[in-house]
C-alpha cells in the first residue's frame, strides 16, 4: 500500500494504486465481451459480485489502453471489444479504522462510459471519456460501509468505441493518523475499560464521551 503525506497533518494510503500514485502497473482479472449490448446481460448475471466464478477470467496487468501514449500496459482492442475488469484487495482491521474516520476516493481515467462496482454494489458511472485526466468520486459513508475486513473487489466495465480507449483506476483513503486506534498491551481480564475525558473510570455501558480500551486498543469516543 502506497502512502503520501498531505497538508494539515493528514496522510493518504492508496488501497489500489493508479499509475499516478507511483506504483505503476496493477494486477487484475479481465474479460473482453463481443458487443456493448453484452454488458447488460453480464450485469444481470452479476459479473461484478464478490463471489463471481473467476475460473474463465484472464489474468492481466493494468492500465489498459489501445494507445501507446495513454497508460498502455496491456493492449485492449477498445474499437472492437467492451471490457470487464476485476481488482481484488485485502483490508485489515486497521485499514477499516482509517476508512471509518477518513475520506475514501475512487480515482479514474477512462475511455469510455465506465460503470464501477464495489463488492457487488454499483458505485458510480461516467459518460464519454476524460483523456489523460483523472476524475474523483468520494464514497459517501453508506458506500464506505461496503468495505470489509478480508477480500474486497472493485470492478469496472467500459464500452467499445470508435476512437481510443483506456482505463486506469484506484482507491485511496485520506485520514488524520492521530485519530486512529493505538495498540496497547492488555491482560485477558482487561478486555474493556472505559474512562471519561478526565481520566476517571466509568461504566462500560455509558454513552459518555471518553477513552475506551477494548481488546487491546485505545479509541477516543467523541
Model-derived segments and spans:
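Extracellular beta-rich ligand/substrate-recognition surface
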Residues: 68-84, 126-134
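Aromatic-lined ligand-binding clefts that engage carbohydrates, nucleic acids, or primary amines
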Residues: 57, 81, 89, 95-118, ...
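Residue-level detector of functionally pivotal "anchor" positions at catalytic/ligand-binding pockets or at interdomain
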Residues: 3, 65, 75, 171-198
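C-terminal tail/sorting-segment detector
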Residues: 209-222
